[in-house]
Design a protein with these regions (language model features):
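Active-site-proximal alpha-helix that buttresses catalytic centers in soluble enzyme cores
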Residues: 2-73, 98-103
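Generic beta-sheet signal
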Residues: 4, 125-136
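Acidic, low-complexity terminal tails and accessory targeting/binding regions
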Residues: 1, 64, 68-71, 78-93, ...
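Short active-site segment of divalent metal-dependent hydrolases/proteases
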Residues: 12, 137-138
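Internal catalytic-core helix/loop-beta-alpha segment
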Residues: 96-126
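Histidine-centered active-site/metal-ligand motif
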Residues: 9, 134, 180-181
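Generic structural signal for well-ordered alpha-helical scaffold segments
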Residues: 33-40, 115-123, 142
Length: 185
C-alpha cells in the first residue's frame, strides 16, 4: 500500500476573497519549515503539489531539503469557484456547510477528480508520496475514504499532515492531521 502524506499549505498572506493566488505569510513560512522537519526523515519522496502559490511555497521547503522537484497537478488545486473575488469568501462559507450531494454537479465532478487522482497514485507507484494541497481537497479525500458526505468532515490545520493509504483504487485513512479552527478570510 502506498502512503499519501496530504499536507495542507501554510497560512496564506491574504484571504480567499482578497487575492486569487496569495503566497505564504511569515506564520505560513514557519509552518512550512516545521512540516518539512517532520517529514524530512521519511524522504526523499515523490511530491505532487497544487499550482497555487501558497502550495508551491509550502512544498519548496521539502523540495530544497530533499533535492527533488514536486510535480504540479491542477487536480489537487483549490475548490473551483465562478464567483467574483469579492463574493468568493461568502460563497465558500456557505458551500462548506453543505454536503457533496447538495453541491453543484461541477463541484461533485471536482471532488471525484481529486479522489480519483489520489486513489490512482497507489496504482501508479509503490512509493509513498507527499501531496501539498488545500483544505477542501483533503476533506474530499477523507470524506471519500470514510463515507462522510459532508464537504467538511474535519478541519486540517495549516501544514498539517494527513496520512492516507492508496491501494486497489481506494483510499483509507491512517491518521488525520492536526486540526485547527479554520476561518475563511
Amino acid at each position: 500500500m502506498t502512503k499519501l502524506f496530504l499536507v495542507r499549505h501554510g497560512q496564506a498572506a491574504a484571504g480567499y476573497d482578497r487575492d486569487l493566488d496569495p503566497g505564504l505569510d511569515e506564520v505560513g513560512r514557519a509552518q512550512a519549515e516545521a512540516m518539512a522537519s517532520a517529514l524530512e526523515p521519511r524522504g526523499p519522496l515523490p511530491m505532487i503539489m497544487s499550482p497555487l502559490r501558497r502550495t508551491r511555497e509550502t512544498a519548496a521547503v521539502l523540495e530544497r531539503r530533499w533535492g527533488v522537484t514536486a510535480r504540479v497537478d491542477p487536480v489537487v488545486g483549490e475548490i473551483p469557484s465562478d464567483e467574483s473575488l469579492a463574493q468568493r469568501g461568502e460563497w465558500l462559507r456557505r458551500v462548506l456547510q453543505g454536503t457533496w450531494a447538495d453541491a453543484t454537479p461541477a463541484l461533485g465532478s471536482w471532488r471525484d477528480s481529486v479522489v480519483a487522482a489520489l486513489a490512482a497514485i497507489g496504482e501508479q507507484t509503490a512509493e509513498d508520496t507527499v501531496v501539498v494541497t488545500h483544505f477542501v481537497a483533503i476533506n474530499a479525500a477523507v470524506g471519500a475514504a470514510t463515507g462522510d458526505d459532508r464537504l467538511v468532515c474535519f478541519r486540517p490545520g495549516n501544514c498539517s499532515i494527513t496520512v492516507l493509504e492508496s491501494a486497489g483504487g481506494r483510499l483509507r485513512v491512517v491518521e488525520l492531521g492536526e486540526q485547527a479552527v479554520t476561518v475563511v478570510r
